[in-house]
Curated annotation (Swiss-Prot):
Belongs to the nitrite and sulfite reductase 4Fe-4S domain family. Pathway: Sulfur metabolism; hydrogen sulfide biosynthesis; hydrogen sulfide from sulfite (NADPH route): step 1/1. Residues 1-26 are annotated as: Disordered. SUPFAM superfamilies: Nitrite and sulphite reductase 4Fe-4S domain-like, Nitrite/Sulfite reductase N-terminal domain-like. It comes from the Bacteria. Component of the sulfite reductase complex that catalyzes the 6-electron reduction of sulfite to sulfide. This is one of several activities required for the biosynthesis of L-cysteine from sulfate. This is Sulfite reductase [NADPH] hemoprotein beta-component. Siroheme binds at C518. Alpha(8)-beta(8). The alpha component is a flavoprotein, the beta component is a hemoprotein. The keyword NADP applies. Its EC number is 1.8.1.2. [4Fe-4S] cluster binds at C469, C475, C514, C518. PANTHER family: SULFITE REDUCTASE [NADPH] SUBUNIT BETA (PTHR11493:SF47), SULFITE REDUCTASE [NADPH] SUBUNIT BETA-RELATED (PTHR11493).
């Protein structure tokens, strides 16, 4: 049953939810989303709602804006629409003040994100993506926290060339951003080849099923040309309609015991239920996870997903579409800060949501099946799968695939490997790269190239369990540094951990420059969330497997204070931990920080409960 506290809202009558007792929820809506722009304005819907309706299925003024060569930017409205095409308009904030002083336009560029369901690319595709990076994106690829690639620094005049190159790799950027189902993640545990294959196929099927059908992407970026034959789809969005979704929607597929996709942090998830031979017998469906919040606004919060029920393999796609369309129809289109699925479930209750999903599927969901996760990190080094193929997971700091002066030559090394590799490459949800499906006879050749380019230079347990978002200088939302700051912080904390004999202890640590939570800091044992220049909120107490949220431990900690704040906790952990106890569990059991149940409870009983 639903054990979450509902949001108190003034809108609509409340109803009792069976089994919840005194908890009361709003009555779910019965009308469909408004589809006329003027009606959307009159109803007080968010600006993005009438913008989507009037966009001509995501065209807007993008085609004309690309022809305006006097500026490196596009209009503000088109900046919202271009997200659906997989892009964000950004500028270099390091030089923003200098350019303003000189009365110059901001140094605009675009971040381009690909759609790669399950994060799998062939060596041929890798080489094309590498060439795009060296030609248009500052000789760097960035593996994201959601199993795809991003390019940064692509200027407007190179957008169509970049898109054409991506298309030549038989890839695209459709729905990589925006109010749609975004890139679908899939488990990458190489030891379970059979289960992974099924998980990957489900991810691809969901991605294809929930993909917007508009022809705007190919029309605008490729001038309507096709690399592969086929007729254009009719100009209609059979699943989304003109309004698409109220907000972003993220889907993942997990295979226990590894939770490297962080299933509880996403809107929709499928947990593989395995028999004794590691065969998939069906899926537990999870709903209502999400990380983003706004500082100082307690009606916004991160939330871990609920297990909605169990579906047979043949019903998984129906369940995915049903969950997404209920969110399409029930989600908040007036306030984008409360528009994610997590708030929809808090508003109407899990039981009502389940009933509507079952109605749309046409059958009852089964009771959830038992499952166990043992962590949300990657398995580094060589692993042999149950099919006899070999897989090498490389640690890539913050996912930044580039040649580092005096350090690993990731871009050059992986390019050289792609030239001889006979398998594929797999991106992980932790921003790392797997050289996958290597025949036993090719391992020595791969190892030699890995050594030549320094791709496996030693990294501590803490570093291997770290993540950071991009933040400054390109992200317009960043309040503080993240990717550029985390390596220095890790060096400081490594010294502290070694002093307490904890250098080999896996502890998850994640950093983001703002509370939107792209690196999922609220489900890491140590989470840093930017508040301002060199200032962070420090969160502690999340579960090592990503199933429990953290709690705010210290507000506005300066960068210079973080090590000193954590060191006494490390000392206590080294002295008083129980066998096998993880750091996040310890700080709760030892009484340093309160446990977060979920959702709105995230903002309750914050701060240290006792001195370390």
């Amino acid at each position: 049953m639903d054990d979450h506290k509902p949001i108190e809202t003034p809108d609509g009558p409340a109803v009792d939810t069976p089994g919840i007792g005194a908890r009361r929820y709003e009555t779910p809506p019965t009308e469909l989303p408004i589809t006329e722009a003027e009606a959307a304005r009159a109803a007080g819907l968010a600006h993005n709602e009438h913008l989507k309706i009037a966009s001509g299925y995501l065209r807007g003024g993008l085609a004309d804006g690309l022809l305006k060569h006097a500026t490196g930017a596009i209009s503000e409205d088109d900046g919202q629409l271009v997200k659906f095409h997989g892009m964000y308009m950004q500028d270099d904030r390091d030089i923003r003040a200098e350019r303003t002083k000189k009365k110059l336009e901001k140094a605009y560029s675009f971040m381009i994100r690909l759609r790669i369901a399950g994060g799998v690319v062939t060596p041929k595709q890798w080489l094309i993506l590498d060439n795009i990076a060296t030609t248009y994106a500052g000789s760097a690829l960035r593996a994201t926290t959601r199993q795809t690639f991003q390019y940064h620094g692509v200027i407007k005049s190179n957008l169509k060339r970049t898109m054409a190159a991506i298309d030549s790799a038989l890839l695209d950027t459709i729905a990589a951003c925006g109010d749609v189902n975004r890139n679908v993640m899939a488990a990458t545990n190489p030891a379970q080849a059979g289960a992974h294959k099924i998980a990957l196929q489900l991810a691809k099927d969901i991605s294809d099923t929930l993909l917007p059908k508009t022809g705007a992407w190919r029309e605008i970026w490729l001038d309507g040309e096709r690399v592969v034959g086929g007729e254009d789809a009719a100009e209609v969005e059979p699943v989304y309609g003109k309004t698409y979704l109220p907000r972003k929607f993220k889907t993942v597929v997990a295979v226990p015991p590894s939770n490297e996709v962080d299933i509880f942090a996403h809107d929709l998830g499928f947990i593989a239920i395995l028999d004794k031979k590691n065969r998939v017998t069906g899926w537990n469906v999870t709903v209502g996870g999400g990380m983003g919040m706004t500082h100082g606004e307690t009606d916004t919060f991160p939330r871990t997903a609920d297990v909605l029920g169990f579906v047979q393999p043949e019903d998984a796609l129906k369940a995915a579409e049903a969950v997404m369309t209920v969110q399409r129809d029930w989600g908040n289109r007036k306030n984008r800060k409360n528009a994610r699925l997590k708030y929809t479930i808090e508003r109407f209750g899990l039981d009502a949501f389940r009933a509507e999903v079952e109605k749309r599927i046409g059958k009852k969901l089964g009771a959830p099946k038992p499952f166990t996760f043992d962590g949300n990190g990657d398995r580094y080094g060589w692993v042999e799968g149950d099919d006899g193929r070999h897989h090498l997971t490389l640690y890539v700091p913050s996912g930044r695939i580039k040649d580092i002066e005096g350090g690993p030559q990731f871009l050059s090394g992986l390019r050289r490997i792609a030239e001889v590799h006979e398998g594929d490459f797999r991106l992980t949800g932790n921003q790392n790269v797997i050289i996958a499906n290597v025949p036993a006879g090719k391992r020595a050749e791969i190892d030699a190239l890995v050594d030549e380019y320094g791709l496996t230079r030693g990294a501590s347990a803490l570093r291997r369990n770290s993540m950071a978002c991009v933040a400054l200088p390109t992200c317009g939302l960043a309040l503080a540094e993240s990717e550029r700051y985390l390596p220095d912080l890790l060096s400081e904390l490594e010294e502290s951990l070694a002093r307490h004999g904890l250098q080999d202890e896996p502890i998850t640590i994640r950093s983001t420059g703002c509370p939107n939570g792209c690196a999922r800091p609220f489900i890491s044992e140590i989470g840093l969330v930017g508040r301002g220049p060199e200032r962070y909120h420090l969160y502690l107490g999340a579960a090592f497997d990503g199933s429990r949220l953290s709690k705010l431990y210290r507000e506005d900690v300066t960068a210079s204070e973080i090590k000193g704040t954590l060191d006494p906790l490390f000392a206590a952990y080294a002295k008083d931990r129980q066998p096998g106890e993880h750091f996040g569990d310890f700080v709760i059991r030892a009484g340093f920080v309160a446990k977060t149940s979920n959702g709105p409870d995230f903002h309750e009983r914050t701060g240290p409960l006792r001195a370390a």
